[in-house]
Amino acid sequence: NLNISRMNGLSGNYGSSFLNDKVNYTPMILCFAQELFFQDINLEVNKKINKKTRSTFVLANQIYNKDFLEGKTKGENGMISSSIIVADITHKIKKGHTIRMELQNLFSQQLKEAEKLAEGDWSMGLIEYTVSPNWFFTVQDMYNWGHEDSKKRLHYLNLNVGYSKKSNRFEIGYGKKREGIFCVGGICKLVPSSNGFNISVSSSF
């Protein structure tokens, strides 16, 4: 599968305002501004190796306007370009027992000079063991090995245990999480960095 997405601002005209705050803005439809907000080009390949093993490989290139998308001061982080490699392998050990392994690597660079040092390159490894239909156990480590500040080349290790019953899901975990955009089910939010236990309960009706 090949997917391409791109998001630019729209050119437009600012109307007059009593406060001169440029709130009154009329966009020009189908007239894209030069400033790029986000771009994603990715290729996904799914391969069934045998009856018990299947794999997914992804190559992606993204351009991310961090200042605009995260509401930060312009020039603080700049425009970030990243190339991403993902390998995901799932193996069925026996009936009801499955292990999944995922490896990711992100190579990034700032396209424009910024006030803050670049976070640079990342690697991520994950092992997930599932006992159907209820239990799953996960170990994940993210390592920011390419940060320009060597003191911030940190590991973000997380351990999670979850239990599912019908339409209910319970999960408890412990680990270190980095600040950033966190997305679940197509809904994204900015979360602060944290270190400790977390408990989540979700139900569908």
Model-derived regions, located:
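Exposed, low-structure sequence patches enriched in small/polar residues
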Residues: 1-205
